[in-house]
Amino acid sequence: MKNIRTKQTPCFRRWSRKGWAAFASLHRHVTIGVLAVTMSILLLATQHASAHDADTAAVLKTLRIDEVGISGSQSAPTRNVQSQTPLFDRKAQAAAPVQTLESALRLAPSVDIRERGGKGMQADIFIRGGSFDQTMVLLNGIDFTDARTGHQSHSLPGDIDCISAVDLLDGVPGVGAFAGAVNIRTAPLKLTYLRFEGAGGQHGYAYANLSGAVTSGRFSLLAAGSYRRSDGYRHNTEFANYNAFVRATYEAPRAGFFDLQAGYQNRTFGSNGFYAAYNPDQWEATSTALASLRWLKQAGRFSFGASASYRKNFDRYDWTRGTAMNRHNTDNVGARLWADYDWRAGTTSLGGDYAFNHIYSTNLGEALSRPHGRYTHAKARSTGNLWLRHAKQWRRFDLAASAGISLTPYGTSALWSLSGGYTPAPGLHLGIGAFQSMRLPTFTDLYYTSPAQINNLDLTPERAVTYLFDAGYMKNSWRLSLQTYYRAGRDIIDWVWREDMGDKWHSEQTSRLDTYGIELSGGYTVADGFLRRVTLSYGYITTDRNSDIIAKGAMDYMRHKAALAVEVHFLRRMSLALTASVYDRNGSYTHYPVPGDPSLSEVRDYEPYFLLDGRLQWEKGICRLYVDATNITDSRYCDLGGIPLPGAWGTAGVALTIGR
């Protein structure tokens, strides 16, 4: 791992304010996954991190405590973020009843997961009252957000067993993270291992996963492949999903640290009512390939980094299964370069990035003079960002400020951020900040036209200024956190119902949307005993809009959200984990009582609902057996437009892990 050097040092047996001495007091080997200079991995539960505590290369190494010295941090592309909030931690939630990334994030108060089908087959990520298009999605710090539509952004080829943590990042420099960014981090379960998991259950559900890792000296390799399928929980909701992912890291003694990742995903799924609630016969198929390479190098007081990434996505949508209606072929290319300088006055960072987006489509973009295969339209655009940031920590205070410019087809825009923190007592941190963000219209916003929708080529970027306050406290096994925010959004893009355009939805940005929210969470976690973990969280959102227009999505935010998680261990090898959550969504939707007939409809308000999930597990040696039950109370609910989601669903599985 970069900045970890092997040397002979005494093995201290108490805390001595040295990096290695903190671990030495544990009297054991330590597996280090993500490690930053301020030991953010130890403070994850406080829901606070400074800008320098962001994700680093997740390379696992087991190191003898008496042979390790820590000299610095690995800079990463996300180091310039203003704050970092944990959404999921694999170690803390290892026994939780979660099978997919969507089910893991559903309990977080900051995130609104809106699913259209079972087991996360089609879902959107909404952050703090924003839309799915306002969410940036990162994989190990690399931006893989889809420029066509946010529907595809988190279609990433990583299974839950490979994901070590998920964080919410605020203040990401540049264009894209209007409401925030979700950073998904992967890491091996162990240094060297081979793991197989298989599961099956109701509705013809089947899941198989094979993963493993090899670590040798300065080299580490993680690889995984999986298959998930179901016959569906109602008509035309069957699905099949294939994932393949690999991540390799190598630290060259002189050349620096290299981090390579690549993956592929293929999905097909019945889309009963997914995009038009009255049509039960829709169908969709997508495939995504992605890759990135990151380089890090430290030279004295300087730290240098660079990254390059590529994502390709194919999407086929059938209004009636078997008859292709829309086809899209998108390419997203990104590159980033940055440098840090540590000096007496703090740390100064200078960086820039470039992104190129291109689409071939049957209906998005500008008409081609000659078709490109089956595609009749195409569009390309480029964006660039430059930023300068300075951060300083002294005693109990920290302060950071950044300024930058974004170069887009819509002109040049200035962006900024400012944050500060204070630690009045051990374990307690108070933080405050403000940052400016913007989002470009997606290709769908600009060009999508259908019998029910009209596009708008005059759209311009959305803009917002967000103000944050957070407080976190951790002592022994307890943690508490509070976060509150206010986002002043301008030129918000949404689909607006227009009777003067023939009763159709029109893509517009005529509104101002101010969003206020508060998030509370607390928890108790221990390694031994009967009661191992209890967490409780609550989130509240309210908005103020300057118009009474009928909009398709901006007002369908999660107004109240509360979640309770409990984990107990008994009979030596048994564990039971339960999660209970209550949801109360603002807004309404159109209900069609007769499938296939849009002439009969009624407007209904979203109703509150309750979900209870559980996992009973037995584990011994290399073997783990489990039984999962989701929506135990068989609640009837929907996240989007009256699309019914699964009732009670039982599955069972086995996981075998060989390794060290």
Task: Give the positions of each predicted feature.
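Extracytoplasmic beta-strand/coil segments of soluble accessory domains associated
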Residues: 102, 106-143, 164
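Outer-membrane beta-barrel signature, preferentially recognizing the C-terminal barrel domain
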Residues: 275-299, 423, 429, 436-490, ...
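Gram-negative outer-membrane beta-barrel transporters
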Residues: 392-396, 486-488, 509-592, 633, ...
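Short acidic/polar hinge/loop motifs at secondary-structure boundaries
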Residues: 142-171, 185
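C-terminal beta-signal and adjacent terminal beta-strands/loops
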Residues: 582-597, 617-660
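N-terminal periplasmic "start-of-domain" segments of outer-membrane beta-barrel proteins
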Residues: 62, 66-96, 123-124, 132, ...
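Flexible loop and strand-edge segments within Gram-negative outer membrane beta-barrel domains
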Residues: 230-237, 241, 251, 255-332
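Short strand-turn segments of transmembrane beta-barrel domains in outer membranes
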Residues: 164-165, 173, 179-214, 225, ...
